[in-house]
Amino acid sequence: MDMTGERRIVAPRQVVWDALNDTVTLKASIPGCESLEKTGGNQMKATAAVKLGPISARFNGAVTLSDIDAPNSYTITGEGQGGVAGFAKGGAKVFLSDDSGATLLKYEVKAQVGGKLAQLGARLIDATAKQMAEQFFTKFSAEVEKLAGLAEAAPGRAGIVAGGGF
């Protein structure tokens, strides 16, 4: 499955970049995310509960950031095992650019599922992936815009206020 999209976030690029590298912000934004912890370098481990059609699964996996060009772009890749439900793996290239006082975030996603999940069919998988992406970006935008407001209210505290960054 391939998916592309973009989102305009009303916050400076550096604040968006910091949030994309902050485990607290990401955990709050990822649908079903139960835990997200930095394990070293640009590595994280994650647990997420996902419902895809009739199948519910808890995925445990690893996430890696690469091709890092701060504060412009990176690639995030991950792979998770969902027990008898199967597996999911994929990645996203994320690009940031300035957009009239805001930040334009563009993404290109490639993902693959296997096991019982793969038997659900491309239409259901694609629809669920698009819904989860929309939920993520809605929450992420709200979190970042809240952080941007805090940074403006307390100059010198720009960046992630919540902590947990890389």
Tell me what each language-model feature is:
Residues 146-166:
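Charge-rich (especially acidic), low-complexity segments
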Residues 4, 58-62, 88-92:
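Short, surface-exposed coil-to-beta transition loops
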Residues 38-79:
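Glycine-rich portal/gate segments that line the openings of hydrophobic small-molecule binding cavities
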Residues 16-20, 26, 65, 107, ...:
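Hydrophobic pocket/interface hotspot
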Residues 1-43, 51, 160-162, 166:
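Hydrophobic ligand-binding cavity/cleft-lining segments
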Residues 116-153:
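A conserved amphipathic terminal alpha-helix motif
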